[in-house]
UniProtKB/Swiss-Prot annotation:
It comes from Desulforapulum autotrophicum (strain ATCC 43914 / DSM 3382 / VKM B-1955 / HRM2). Pfam families: Ribosomal_L36. The gene is rpmJ. GO terms for molecular function: structural constituent of ribosome. Belongs to the bacterial ribosomal protein bL36 family. Keywords: Ribonucleoprotein, Ribosomal protein. InterPro entries: Ribosomal_bL36, Ribosomal_bL36_sp. This is Large ribosomal subunit protein bL36. GO terms for cellular component: cytoplasm; ribonucleoprotein complex; ribosome. PANTHER family: 50S RIBOSOMAL PROTEIN L36, CHLOROPLASTIC, LARGE RIBOSOMAL SUBUNIT PROTEIN BL36C. GO terms for biological process: translation.
Length: 37
């Protein structure tokens, strides 16, 4: 899980979701998981 100021989709499997007001990117590739901080 990377914490970034701007989260972007990296590949076609990345999905941007909003959980409890936090924007996250979830993906089957574990390296692509991100959270906005």
């Amino acid at each position: 899980m990377k914490v970034r100021a701007s989260v972007k989709k990296i590949c076609k499997d990345c999905k941007i979701i909003r959980r409890k007001g936090v924007i996250r990117v979830i993906c089957i590739t574990k390296r692509h998981n991100q959270r906005q901080g």
